[in-house]
From Swiss-Prot:
One of its GO terms (biological process) is endoplasmic reticulum membrane fusion. This is Protein sey1. It comes from Aspergillus terreus (strain NIH 2624 / FGSC A1156). Residues 763-765 are lumenal. Residues 50-299 form the GB1/RHD3-type G domain.
Amino acid sequence: MATNGHFASLGGDSSDKTAYEHGVQVIDENKEFNPNLSKYLSIEDVTPAGFNYHLISVFGSQSTGKSTLLNHLFGTRFSVMSELERRQTTKGIWMSKNKNTEGSMASNILVMDVEGTDGRERGEDQDFERKSALFALATSEVLIVNIWEHQVGLYQGANMGLLKTVFEVNLQLFLKDKNTTHRSLLFFVIRDFVGMTPLKNLQKTLMEDMSRLWDSISKPAGLEKSTVHDYFDFQFYGLPHKGYQPEQFVAETKKLSLRFREGHKDPSLDAQKGEFSDGGVFLPEYHRRIPADGFSRYAEGIWDQIVNNKDLDLPTQQELLAQFRCDEILREVMVAFDEAIVPFEDKQSQAARLGEPEILGGLGAAMRTARAKAVKSFETEASRYHKGVYQRKRAELESKIDTRLKALFQGQLNATHKSGINEFSDAVTTAVKSGQKKGTGYDFAEIVSEEVKKAMEKFEEVARTTTVEGTSWSDYSQELALYEKELAEVSARLRRDEMRRLATRVERWVQSRLGESVGLEFNALGSGRAGGGAPETGDKPTEKKFWDRVWNVFVETVLDAERRFTDRASSFDASLEEVDVGLWRLRRKSWGVLRAKIDEEMIEGNLLLKLRENFEDKFRYDDAGVPRIWRPTDDIEGVYTRARESTLTLIPLLSKFKLSETSAPPPLDRWVGHTPSSATAADEEDLPPIGGVDEEEGKSLEEEMTILSDSKRQELIVRFKKAADGVYVEAKRSAIGGMTQVPLYFYGILLALGWNEIIAVLRNPAYFFLLFVCAVAAYVTYQLNLWGPILKMTEAASNQALAEGKKRLREFLESSDTGRQAIAMSASGSEQHEMSRLNKQGKAAASDEDGDDL
């Protein structure tokens, strides 16, 4: 059969499962650890077993049949010594998984075949013997001591030196970890047992030797009275001679193999009295509590300390192993965690860069699933290692996961916050516009209340579905409070904006009403038939109370507007302070509207026209409103003087806004009121200053009420007098023109020259009838005052006929060949003019010449 060296090369260099059919060389003869041990355990499906595996080591002298024993017990294929050559076969330490298919045996049994002691190849070198014993004791649950029956009672032959080493090593391990008593089972398999000496006697001999060995070793303080039974359990079994009794040997080994199963300690047995268990050999206290997936790393660390002659510290090795494996498991878990979470992180980052908040759907479920899966996977794989390291690494894992999930959670809340604020503002604005379009009215406060409720419910829904139970960062009460606060701020801003729009609408209404009402009052100035002395009552108001009427109209209009504003503002859930500010602004804006309307009406051209109309009404009409027809005998100068002076009294009346009852300006300062304490700078910045109200303006109330300055008033008087003089001259001319008479001789000449025609008309009935009809028509036209319109219509018709004739002539000239030739000849060296712009003399009209100048 091939040697172990052949197997070592296969186990070390090939990943093929067939290369490990003889097992794997864990440590070679040069004390080198095989890094392929983890690969072998994976191939044999031991790695996922967790704690559900068992490790057995076999000790004994070289060439005593250790490998043969293991092959028969566990179905392994360790190399055995050739019967023809007495030389070393097992080199270093080999391992193989139990291949025995007996169902009653424990699963995942790993067997280590340790190089035999007392071999000639190593001679006096006992270093490897000690190191291998220490390695086996640190890793194995059961130590099988393979001895022959005739060696019982001997020191060297019974491997007493090796067992003494085992005892010393065990104490060394105990000193490093006093909190744990490392128990192991020493299973003596007595080979070539013939039964001449009862097994009980052999047990007694071996136990006496064990006690002497234990007493002979040096013990640390506090352990002087300890016994070997405090650290080891013992079992014994005798096997027949393999060569002389092969069938019995096979049967007994099969029987012995059944004892390699999980068992329990029988408290009724007393080892010191020679009472030993013959049940299952694998007790829970024997297990080193190293998970299968970390065994190779643990074994490598143990061997590294042993081979470098360092004090073996199993707790430290277990912690180092736990540190290494927990880090590996943590990395593996985080890979799966990243696959689930990174897409959400990327989406959130991109949305943040674009400045477009996006609520990630399914984020909460993904976060909870990923976290639970990661923690569960880590717990399943890492909880089998050192408890302190596991707990520390689990806390580290949870910290890493929670840090990233918290960032996602906060980003989700921020996105919900921003989008919620935008949606809330848009929803309120849309609802308000919809109410305005329908014209049915709307309750702004109700709209805001409903939208706030929807926004809060949506935020809470997103936050609730994104939380991860059991985490401190899932408390979103602070974010919810901030969101509610900002909603309140936005609501207040929207309410202020809506009140501004309401104020604007009311101001436009005031402007419209004042423009109409005040315009009527100014238009009434053009009708002066009542005169300045009109009665106080009746349909003809006196001009002296002009400003009283304007002020009353203004106050009533603004009061009506204030009622409208207050009623509408109540639906906004506005505070009293906001309403006060709105009314205060409305009064100031309304005064500005009135003053602008007054200034518009008092433009010099408009005022002069109204003064002329007022004068003409007084001059051209009598007190009853009947038009005057001037005769030479009428007192034109007297009427003119009275009308002019009466109209001139309007100019000083209109120059200052004064009430007739008090002869003082209206109480504008009291009417506007003081600036409300709740008014902000933004509320005042668009308001024009008012004299007598705003102290910083520097204008008094008297100056604010001055409509016309003295210079403008004097200029207006001069211009009005000129206009009145023109009306007077026209009236004088009409009176004098009425005095012109046709000379009497003119009628005699007319009768003499037209006698024949008169006789012809009178004699001809047709002519006479036509003359009669014309006379009647002329009389009727005169009585109806239609001569003027008829003459105007006749003139307009003649002008239209002339324009149409010019147009037709131009079209004819442009469309005919003769006309185009004539136009071309007249155009050379002369100016061109449209025919429609020629005057009666055939020359260019003045407007045409002016256009050429531009």
